[in-house]
Each structure stands twice: as C-alpha cells, then as structure tokens.
Curated annotation (Swiss-Prot):
This is Terpene synthase 6. Its EC number is 4.2.3.-, 4.2.3.46, 4.2.3.47. One of its GO terms (biological process) is terpene biosynthetic process. InterPro entries: Isoprenoid_synthase_dom_sf, Terpene_cyclase-like_2. GO terms for molecular function: metal ion binding; terpene synthase activity. A motif (NDxxSxxxD/E motif) lies at residues 222-230. The lineage of its organism: Eukaryota, Amoebozoa, Evosea, Eumycetozoa, Dictyostelia. Contains several highly conserved motifs that are important for catalytic activity including the aspartate-rich 'DDxx(x)D/E' motif and the 'NDxxSxxxD/E' motif, both of which are involved in complexing metal ions to coordinate the binding of the isoprenyl diphosphate substrate in the active site.
Amino acid sequence: MKQHILWDLNNYINQDYTLPKINCTFDIKTNINSSVKEDQEKWILEFFGNSIEKSKKYLGQQTFLIYMFSFPFASPDELKCIFKIMDWAFIIDDFYFESKAKGMSYLEKLFKTNKDKSKDKFIKLFWEIINEYKQIGKKDSIDVLINEIYSWAKSAVQCSKNDQISSNSTLAEYMESRYYDIGIIMALASSTTLISIPKEIRESKIFKQLEYWFVVCNTLINDCYSFNKEKNEPVLTNYVKIKTLQCGSIQTSLDFVAETIENSLTEINNHSNQLIQQYPNNINLKQYIKSLKYLTSGHLHVSSICNRYK
C-alpha cells in the first residue's frame, strides 16, 4: 500500500551531509565552438522581447555551459539548433508547465498547429526550430526528436508523478513515474539528428535496456545535485528524499544514489558493448553511443558547477 507522506526537512534539520563524489568512467570533453554563445544570447534576448532584465536572469542559469559539456562534438549549426530547442524546453517548462498554466489541450495544439497560423510564441518558435533541424538532420531522427519532446512535455503537464510517487516507492517505481521528466532522452535526441538508427535497433531489447540505464543514471545525477535546491520543497520528486524517508539518513540516501549512479554507468557500458557486438558494422550506432556517454559525463560535470542546479 502506498504511503503518501510528504517530505519535511525539519525532521532532519540536525543532520550533516556532504554530496558524494561520483566516479565516472566516461571521458569528458568541452565543445570548441564557444563563439555560438553570442548567438544564444541574441536569441534569448529576442525571445524575451528585447528585455535585458529577463534575458540576463535566464542566461544567469548558465544553460550554455550545460550544452558545451553535454554536446562536445556538435558543429556550430547543430549547436545552434540544440541550444534553441533545449532553451525553448527550459523556458516553456518554467512559464507554463511547472505553474500548470497550460494543460493537455495546449500541448495537443502545440504539436498539431501549423506555426504560420498560430499567434502563440512558443508554438511558432517550436516549429521554426524544427524547420532549422530539417536543414541539417535526417527525417527519421527529427521525427524521433519530436516524439521525445512530446513525451517529455506530456509528462510535464500531466504532473501525474506527484500522485504515483510515494514515500515507500522503490527505485523501479520511482523511475517508471519520472522516466521522461528531466528530458534526458529528448536532450540526446536533439544532438543525434544527423545520424539514423534503424528501427530494428531502436526496438531491440538491448537498446531499450541501454536507454533505461541512461535515464536512471541521469535522473539520479539530477536528484543528487538538485537536492540542496529542492530540500525545502515537500514533494517527493527527488529520490534522495524518498530514500531518506525510508532509512532516516540523508547521507546514507545520498551515498545510495551515488552508488546506483556508478552501477548505472557500468550497465550503460555493458549494454553498449552488447549492441556494438551485435551490430559491429553500424557506424551510426557507435556515434549514438558515444554521444550518449559524453552527454552523461557532461551532465555529471556541469551538475556540480552550473547555476541552474544550485
């Protein structure tokens, strides 16, 4: 039976804890195309109607730092598409989804409305960005990106996670509820539109397991490094809180999450190797796995230094 006990930091106020050091076996690299930052700053300024105050506030979250480490091999044109779609997602989530200002009816309109007929800023921008992707990417991979954005947005607007997650949720139950929440599959799809992965591979059991551990790993990275930011909120959309309610110790819970992240990295490696052994001649698959690993190591790195997570 689910126990809907809310988190209350006051119950653990006397506990000291430190964020654990996570041993990542994946390489890390930064993108050399740092000049694209000027394009992002200009785009964000236009997005906020040339409001310097609003654009500075958003840019202060250092999202470009996230992109530089998460997508180290993206070309300037690709990086421009990536920052636009990811910034679009961050902003629409902050403006509409988290505040519950928009629901499923808006979401259906967003994905079905012709941008030329819509007066809504987010709808118009979304399809403009997708059209930019079409200039450089593969149709099937862009379709995957659109589907992943929809899955993320649907998860965000439904907010069903608050009802499904309870204080006695297992990690598997927690992941089932939060699978699309942080948008990590969407982020990977945004950076792999230049390559095509055959349907046979995408639907294989090993590929789905690789994706699962990729999501587990990155969701828990988010939970670990967002805990300080979220610790005063009563909701249980952070596994550190759930584990603490179960065991009584914040430090023990953080250590458990760190250990699970490291185990997830091992699972990612194992399933990656199995896929490459099964499809040894598929160069695109190797590139996809490379992107997945660098996105993970980049996410881990920026989570400890980026203002968006503080």
